[in-house]
Amino acid sequence: MAKLHITTWGCQMNEYDSSKMADLLNSTHGLELTDKPEEADILLLNTCSIREKAQEKVFSQLGRWKNWKKDKPDLIIGVGGCVASQEGEHIRERAPFVDIVFGPQTLHRLPEMINQIRSGDRAVVDISFPEIEKFDRLPEPKAEGPTAFVSIMEGCNKYCSFCVVPYTRGEEVSRPVDDVLFEIAQLAEQGVREVNLLGQNVNAYRGETFDGGICTFAELLRLVAAIDGIDRLRYTTSHPIEFTDDIIEVYRDTPELVSFLHLPIQSGADRVLTMMKRNHTALEYKAIIRKLRAVRPNIQISSDFIVGFPGETAEDFEQTMKIIEQVNFDMSFSFIYSARPGTPASDLPDDVSENEKKDRLAHLQQRINHQAMQFSRLMLGTEQRILVEGPSKKDIMELTGRTETNRVVNFIGTPNMIGKFVDIKITDVYSNSLRGEVIRTEDQMGLRIVESASSVIARTRKEDDLGVGKYAVNL
């Protein structure tokens, strides 16, 4: 059987896309996925352009693959993702041995591209933006454990001055709501208990309904939570200016929606937020968090931060540190600013020294880590409900799972617990994980009421004096 290797860099959207590529090429070409690139007949590189020197990283990797192509002339090499979308034909100008260049919105055309190369075409470059077409061409989802990612939309319309996403993934396009619900229902039938909705800006979701209407993100959350078998619901990533009150109401009355939110702010200084074109203030961000905690007091908040943005002063950075303390963030993805080619911010003078950037980043991360450890210590001795994902990476004789607030917990258990919930008493706290002992299995929780088929069939419709229908069991 021919083999496929995919190297993936970047966000969860890229991870999701890579899994779909693997499933697609398995169904169309019988390709078996391998983690050993030297064994592969097709090599795909799914790239990310968010970080500094993304392009050079790509060509460095391609240079290693070039040597294998000399020994195996029929080897097909493809480059996809956001760097491919940015660079297009320039990739082949620097690396003419690359056979296929495709963007995030054209990965569904890979089977045809591969056939073209095998038919003798020199190269194929397709980095177009065909709306949401790719989701219509992908195979049925395959569950790999009790958790799954589902993409609900692509692209972003916000055009933050530092961000390449609108240029590499296009503007916001939402999947029809029925398509999203059908994919999640299929995953639930395969044993998925937790689903994570993906998009560059998920709370801007506006999916078309079967009757031509529009489903908002808040409505989608309620619909997904109602799918039988889905007991936990997460999403990433969202934008503060789209975080409307109807979403907050879902936190009030939908227990399936976890008490964890990743809501990027990037900076705590209004002056910097304006230069970033974030279109909100620090005060408006804090107002969202205040409303959330009014309906879900135990919710944990994580965020993204960029330090050393052009023009960021020491006072601006102190404003960021201040909001970190005020919001009491539990976690963060924080980075030193680096200009992305083609973005408005790349024209600004990069006037913060590298040493200052590094100092600020270290200071920020130290503060976040301190707060995270405080949250973890508060969990010591408490009971936490864990969705068991599988064997622990640190010790295959142990199991691992996550709390509702996204904490990793390792514990001693039995294989039949995988894919189910267990209640754990937290006994130890570490920097990146917790440890505990099982005090209750899912069978002991009474999560689901088992009802015989005959009792369901026995339900009959009865009307009251007003003609209102009710279903009751004949006794």
From Swiss-Prot:
Keyword RNA-binding on entry: no
Domain MTTase N-terminal positions: 2-119
Keyword Thylakoid appears in the UniProt entry: no
Main location: cytoplasm
Described purpose of this protein according to its UniProt entry: Catalyzes the methylthiolation of N6-(dimethylallyl)adenosine (i(6)A), leading to the formation of 2-methylthio-N6-(dimethylallyl)adenosine (ms(2)i(6)A) at position 37 in tRNAs that read codons beginning with uridine.
EC number(s) reported in the record: 2.8.4.3
GO molecular function terms noted in the UniProt entry: 4 iron, 4 sulfur cluster binding; metal ion binding; N6-isopentenyladenosine methylthiotransferase activity
InterPro entries xrefs: Elp3/MiaA/NifB-like_rSAM, Methylthiotransferase, Methylthiotransferase_CS, Methylthiotransferase_N, Methylthiotransferase_N_sf, MiaB_methiolase, rSAM, rSAM_horseshoe
Cofactor, free-text remark: Binds 2 [4Fe-4S] clusters. One cluster is coordinated with 3 cysteines and an exchangeable S-adenosyl-L-methionine.
Pfam name, any one: UPF0004
Domain (TRAM) ranges: 377-440
Subunit structure of this chain's protein: Monomer.
Paired cysteines (S-S): none
Protein family membership: Belongs to the methylthiotransferase family. MiaB subfamily.
Annotated HAMAP family: tRNA_metthiotr_MiaB
Catalytic activity: N(6)-dimethylallyladenosine(37) in tRNA + (sulfur carrier)-SH + AH2 + 2 S-adenosyl-L-methionine = 2-methylsulfanyl-N(6)-dimethylallyladenosine(37) in tRNA + (sulfur carrier)-H + 5'-deoxyadenosine + L-methionine + A + S-adenosyl-L-homocysteine + 2 H(+)
Protein name: tRNA-2-methylthio-N(6)-dimethylallyladenosine synthase
